[in-house]
Amino acid sequence: MVSLEKNDHLMLARQLPLKSVALILAGGRGTRLKDLTNKRAKPAVHFGGKFRIIDFALSNCINSGIRRMGVITQYQSHTLVQHIQRGWSFFNEEMNEFVDLLPAQQRMKGENWYRGTADAVTQNLDIIRRYKAEYVVILAGDHIYKQDYSRMLIDHVEKGARCTVACMPVPIEEASAFGVMAVDENDKIIEFVEKPANPPSMPNDPSKSLASMGIYVFDADYLYELLEEDDRDENSSHDFGKDLIPKITEAGLAYAHPFPLSCVQSDPDAEPYWRDVGTLEAYWKANLDLASVVPELDMYDRNWPIRTYNESLPPAKFVQDRSGSHGMTLNSLVSGGCVISGSVVVQSVLFSRVRVNSFCNIDSAVLLPEVWVGRSCRLRRCVIDRACVIPEGMVIGENAEEDARRFYRSEEGIVLVTREMLRKLGHKQER
């Protein structure tokens, strides 16, 4: 393990990102989000009033000083590709800055699409090698968080690791959804199990397990060697968590990086924020978190901006209807192009170009872009997919049986409404 002085840290914080390439795994469908991902990959799902989920990983790279990125796509990639082309095309290739789109290719040696997360990188090795990076940062494109990857790179170099895995404690009852690890006093990973049925607890806290966040730093040459070896293994599932990380752990070359060391927070006393919005309830809750008085995730931090594609839209407008009722909101996010006419919106997130007509009451709802809400509607604890036309007088979120019959209702009572569901009920979706 190498001990570095403060000046060395500052120098490495500038140099290491320039020697790195980030690969963002963005090909997943996200089946637990149900119909929300029928026509788009999970990283392309809207979030936070104006963003896409992948904007967080991309923005973290830019803010960390990493200017070379590859986005690995597969499932329903058109929306994702379009978003990146529109919103992330400001790089200067002459300065060796870029975002490369790396789709599944079905290469000549086989007929498989990506067989796993590791295989997604393996199939693009010929392209990735041309980047001539010293370090490769592997990221999931479907998590919500702010992280300075330069701090993780420094930790990787200081510990003399060949592979570093970002980790954080999670409640033990949730740990089966993650890779779970045990570490020694130097953060060397001594045991790693992917999605165990009975997760081991942390020695100092029996209520929690130490979970992998799916964020990795590799020495580039070591990663390429591992991937080529894994590609030849017919018994491998070609996945980082299931195959590569356990193998590296056995070799004694994997170290853990505690997420609090690199989590970017405006309030140093706040809990580190990282969310896997993989279920409808988690997605709904993470959106509404941003509408709270003091949200856990600070989206207003000028020192760590989250970038996205910005349309040219007029400001949101709140107007009174013909009866004199005023449009008003409380504890809500309302994006550009929205019009609220004589209705009340409480603790909700309205994306761009949403129109709420008179006499409506909207509470704890997430309305994606271009939703049209007819008069006298009541919407509660729901997610309304893009461009839905909610007919006049419709009530959602008040009758569990009725919601489950017409739409998708989760076990937690969150209702998802899509255009296809509304069409099946006989409601036209063209305005």
UniProtKB/Swiss-Prot annotation:
Residues with site note (Could play a key role in the communication between the regulatory and the substrate sites): 74, 113
Keyword Transferase: yes
Signal peptide boundaries: none
Effect noted on mutating residue 114 to F: Shows a decrease of affinity for the substrates and less than 2-fold activation by fructose 1,6-bisphosphate in the ADP-glucose synthesis direction
Recorded consequence of changing residue 195 to Q: 600-fold decrease of the affinity for alpha-D-glucose 1-phosphate compared to the wild-type. In contrast, kinetic constants for ATP, magnesium and fructose-1,6-bisphosphate are similar in mutant and wild-type cases
Effect ascribed to mutating residue 295 to S: In SG5 mutant
Gene3D superfamilies: Hexapeptide repeat proteins, Spore Coat Polysaccharide Biosynthesis Protein SpsA, Chain A
Pathway: Glycan biosynthesis; glycogen biosynthesis
InterPro entries attached to this UniProt entry: ADP-Glc_PPase, ADP_Glu_pyroP_CS, GlgC_bac, GlmU/GlgC-like_hexapep, NTP_transferase_dom, Nucleotide-diphossugar_trans, Trimer_LpxA-like_sf
Keywords linked to the UniProt accession: Allosteric enzyme, ATP-binding, Carbohydrate metabolism, Glycogen biosynthesis, Glycogen metabolism, Nucleotide-binding, Nucleotidyltransferase, Transferase
Amino acids binding beta-D-fructose 1,6-bisphosphate: 39, 419-423, 429-431
Nucleotidyltransferase in keyword set: yes
Inducers of expression: mRNA stability is at least partially under the control of CsrA; loss of csrA leads to higher transcript levels, possibly mediated by protein binding to the mRNA.
Free-text activity regulation comment from the record: Allosterically activated by fructose-1,6-bisphosphate (F16BP), hexanediol 1,6-bisphosphate, NADPH and pyridoxal phosphate. Inhibited by AMP and by high concentrations of MgCl(2).
BP GO terms, sorted: glycogen biosynthetic process; protein homotetramerization
Effect ascribed to mutating residue 44 to T: In SG14 mutant; lower apparent affinities for substrates, fructose-1,6-bisphosphate and AMP
Binding positions for AMP per the UniProt entry: 40, 46, 52, 130, 370, 386
Domain of life: Bacteria
One Pfam family it belongs to: NTP_transferase
Homology family: Belongs to the bacterial/plant glucose-1-phosphate adenylyltransferase family.
Chain's role: Involved in the biosynthesis of ADP-glucose, a building block required for the elongation reactions to produce glycogen. Catalyzes the reaction between ATP and alpha-D-glucose 1-phosphate (G1P) to produce pyrophosphate and ADP-Glc.
Note: Displays cooperative behavior and a bibi mechanism with sequential binding of ATP and G1P, followed by ordered release of pyrophosphate and ADP-Glc.
Name used for this protein in its record: Glucose-1-phosphate adenylyltransferase
Gene source species: Escherichia coli (strain K12)
